[in-house]
Amino acid sequence: MKKNIQIAIDGPAGAGKSTIAKIVAEALDFTYIDTGAMYRAVTYKAMQQNIHLDDEAKLAEMLAASTIDLKPSPQGQLVFLDGHNVSADIRSNEVTSSVSQVAAHAKVRELLVAQQQKLAANGGVVMDGRDIATHVLKNAELKIFMSATVEERARRRFIDNQKRGIDSSLEKLQEEIALRDKKDSEREASPLIQAEDAIFLDTTALSIDDAAQAILKLAEEKML
């Protein structure tokens, strides 16, 4: 039985990737790697240091001098930036609306991809993001492309924000998600596209548990 496989999950904002990836990782006793949190951490630090988000060279220089650690905890994965817990800070509306701008820079992606590949080198990982199957883990044994309608993804984000105590408008969230889809799919550096060998999973009408079970079934087949 091949145990330490790599599972790559890609998809647009609000598709449920992180929530479902965490459940899959826990069920398989795998490590979960949230690549989106890494890009959010870079965005947050740049904003804190007043670095212009279009300044690729400065962003790359800042990132090269930074440490981003992902640590499991009973409350879920915690994100540490230069030793400080920024798990809540990186989920702000300001960071959410700016992260695609930072992620579009090839030098930033290059540095983070190297870190992500190192984390996944020994397998036994579930990694989610925008370009995992197409770029970061091209040889992953299981590749999933997860999506849902813009309306459903906005509804989920709205509920998440309410739980976190973040004020948001459902209509504005729909606009932001549609814009982020456009930015992510049209960027030059590793655009959001489905890998040829990825399995498409539409989560619009699926519960979180149903989607996780579908992936677990596929994972078990790959591990035989």
Curated annotation (Swiss-Prot):
Gene3D superfamilies, alphabetized: P-loop containing nucleotide triphosphate hydrolases
Localization per Swiss-Prot or TrEMBL: Cytoplasm
Coiled-coil parts of chain: none
Binding site for ATP: G11, P12, A13, G14, A15, G16, K17, S18, T19
Pfam families in the record: Cytidylate_kin
Domain of life, per lineage: Bacteria
Keyword terms, alphabetized: ATP-binding, Cytoplasm, Kinase, Nucleotide-binding, Transferase
EC numbers: 2.7.4.25
Enzyme class: transferase
Catalysed conversion reaction: CMP + ATP = CDP + ADP; dCMP + ATP = dCDP + ADP
Record-level GO cellular component terms: cytosol
GO molecular function annotation: ATP binding; CMP kinase activity; dCMP kinase activity
BP terms from Gene Ontology: nucleobase-containing small molecule interconversion; pyrimidine nucleotide metabolic process
Family, as annotated: Belongs to the cytidylate kinase family. Type 1 subfamily.
Protein name: Cytidylate kinase
Native source species: Lysinibacillus sphaericus (strain C3-41)
